[in-house]
Every structure is written in C-alpha cells, then in structure tokens.
C-alpha cells in the first residue's frame, strides 16, 4: 500500500463527492452508521488543496441516532433522519456551517437519500441543533435559528466587546461577537480599499482571545442595490441592506464564503444601524451573493434565514 493510500485507508473504496455553496467547498461521504474513523489528520489530508482533494470542510451524512447530540435531537424531533457531521479543513469538529447545510441537502437530494421538491422543506440535525431547509427556485433557504450576543448586555449596550488586529490594518479595530450556534467576531471597515487591503492569509488576533477560537468577519456597508422584494425570501420588504464581506474561518483560513458568517455580519451591521435598519440583507462575498433575512421564529425569538445556491461538482472513488 502506498504512503498516500495508507493515510487515506479508512476512506479507501468509498465514494466521495465535492460540492459548493457560493465558493465554500466541501467533501461529502455517505456513512449512515458513522463507521469511518475520521480523525483530524485524515480529514486534513483529504481537504489539503495540494496533496488531497481540496476543500474548506468535510461533511459526513450519517443517521441522526449515531451521535449523542443526534439522540438528544430525536427526543424532541423524532423525524430528523439525517445528521450533518461537519469538520473544518484542519480536521477539527465544528458546530455548524450555513453554506455547508445547504450543500448537504443538495447532496442528500442528488444521491437519492431524500426527495425534496421546490417549496418543500427538510429538517437536518447538526451540533447546533435542528436546521429547517426549504428548497427554492434558485437554491435553498435555511432557518439558521436565533442569533445572539456572545457577551450579552455588555455588547448590546456598548456596540462592541473586543478588539481585532489584522495584517493590513494599522491599528486594532473594535468588534462585536455574535453567536450563530458557532462563534463570530464582526469588524466594520470604512471603505472597500481597507477591506481589499487585508491579508487574511494570516489569522487576525482578537483581544480578549476567545477560549475556543472564533470566525472573524470584516464588513463594509453598501448602498441599496435592489428594489423592495427582489431577494424574494419572505415577500416584499420596505428596503434591503447590503454589505461586502471577507472572512477568516476558524480552522480553515480565508474562504470565498461563510454562511454563518454572513448571518453574523448582517446581524451586527443591522444592530449598529439602529431601529430603522432593514430586515433583509444582501451579503456580497468573494464567491457570490447570499440573502439574509431576520424573522420572528416559532419560539418568539428573532431567527435568521439564509438563502443561496448549492451545487455538486464531482464524484470520485478512492482506490
């Protein structure tokens, strides 16, 4: 057995599929009973863009009952069949990925593991809870659940809770920490030039440093670009906000897109904008455009709906 085959031994003979959502790309496998041993080194080798298949993350489709988190989900949601077992490119386990869950549902559908027509929805188990995904004419819309301030009232009152230093910025910038089931730190910049001048090949430094790391989003607000109702997620809206976004993902580095990051960035920008800020946002990332909408959820909390496309790219079998 070759050195490379030995390193990938637990995936030998398995079919792997690559998919993407706004350029955020993933490797998928179907492993209903979660039998494959996905240690961090194996996942990192597969996701390596020079010596592996290359991806921002690795996603296993498994039955919900195979995970302890999934078993807890089934106590309240017994019809959640599939669990998105998500790992970052470095092999670390992550709670949630907004682009990943859209691509995951597209993977399940194209593999014949679920049937989902336009207008129908499916519930997916994740480490951040159950996510409801609806198929639309142009892709998928995900109820990402409620967003929250990581540091609570202190962040709400001051509008910031940390400082971020990044290569390309002369001085640290104030930031706001947002949870989308996973941690985010959002920084607003004043111009496209500042955003484009960032070197996100080097991880930004956050003070105080989050115990479990964080995803860092840099945003620039834009003028309104569309007439009311154009993004079509939940009907007409009096106005639509817009931002540009670049992100450094925890355990990955800079990516072309981050779904939970788009939600967190829109939430922070909307909060900074005050009571008159819109509920619908277009988030422009290097890999495309995502629509983010804030709605009242069934639990009477403010939920975030993320909409965008997802496609499968290729399928391969390791030998």
Language-model features, listed with the residues they occupy:
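A glycine-rich beta-to-alpha transition motif near the start of alpha/beta enzyme domains, typified by
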Residues: 1-137, 185-319
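Short glycine/proline-enriched coil/turn segments at helix->beta-strand junctions
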Residues: 136-139, 172-174
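Intrinsically disordered, low-complexity regions enriched in acidic/Ser/Thr/Pro/Gln residues
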Residues: 142-144
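Short beta-strand-to-loop element that shapes/binds the nucleotide-sugar donor at the catalytic cleft/hinge
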Residues: 147
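C-terminal domain-closing interface element
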Residues: 150, 156-169, 302-319
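Short, conserved active-site entrance elements at the starts or edges of catalytic domains
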Residues: 155-161, 207, 212
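Internal active-site segments that recognize and position negatively charged phosphoryl groups
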Residues: 162-196, 202
């Amino acid at each position: 057995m070759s050195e490379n085959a030995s390193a990938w031994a637990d995936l030998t003979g398995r079919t792997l599929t690559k998919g993407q959502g706004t350029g955020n790309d993933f490797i998928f496998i179907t492993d209903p009973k979660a039998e494959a041993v996905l240690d961090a080194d194996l996942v990192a080798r597969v996701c390596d863009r020079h010596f592996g298949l290359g991806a921002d993350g690795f996603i296993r489709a498994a039955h919900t009952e195979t995970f302890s988190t999934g078993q807890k989900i089934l106590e309240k949601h017994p019809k959640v069949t599939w669990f998105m077992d998500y790992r970052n490119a470095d092999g670390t386990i992550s709670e949630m990925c907004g682009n990943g869950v859209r691509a995951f549902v597209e993977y399940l559908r194209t593999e014949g593991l679920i049937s989902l027509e336009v207008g129908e929805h499916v519930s997916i188990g994740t480490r951040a809870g159950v996510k409801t995904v609806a198929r639309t004419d142009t892709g998928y819309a995900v109820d990402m659940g409620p967003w929250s301030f990581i540091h609570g009232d202190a962040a709400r009152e001051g509008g910031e809770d940390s400082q971020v230093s990044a290569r390309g910025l002369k001085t640290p910038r104030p930031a706001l920490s947002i949870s989308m089931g996973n941690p985010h730190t959002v920084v607003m910049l004043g111009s496209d030039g500042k955003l484009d001048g960032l070197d996100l090949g080097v991880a930004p430094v956050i003070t105080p440093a989050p115990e479990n790391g964080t995803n860092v989003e840099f945003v620039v607000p834009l003028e309104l670009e569309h007439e009311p109702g154009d993004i079509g997620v939940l009907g007409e809206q009096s106005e639509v906000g817009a931002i540009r976004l670049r992100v450094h993902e925890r355990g990955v580095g800079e990516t072309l897109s981050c779904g939970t990051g788009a939600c967190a960035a829109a939430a922070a920008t909307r909060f900074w904008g005050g009571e008159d800020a819109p509920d619908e946002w277009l988030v422009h990332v290097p890999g495309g455009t995502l629509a983010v909408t804030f709605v009242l959820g069934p639990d009477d909390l403010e939920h975030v709906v993320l909409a965008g496309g997802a496609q499968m790219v290729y399928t391969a079998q390791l030998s």
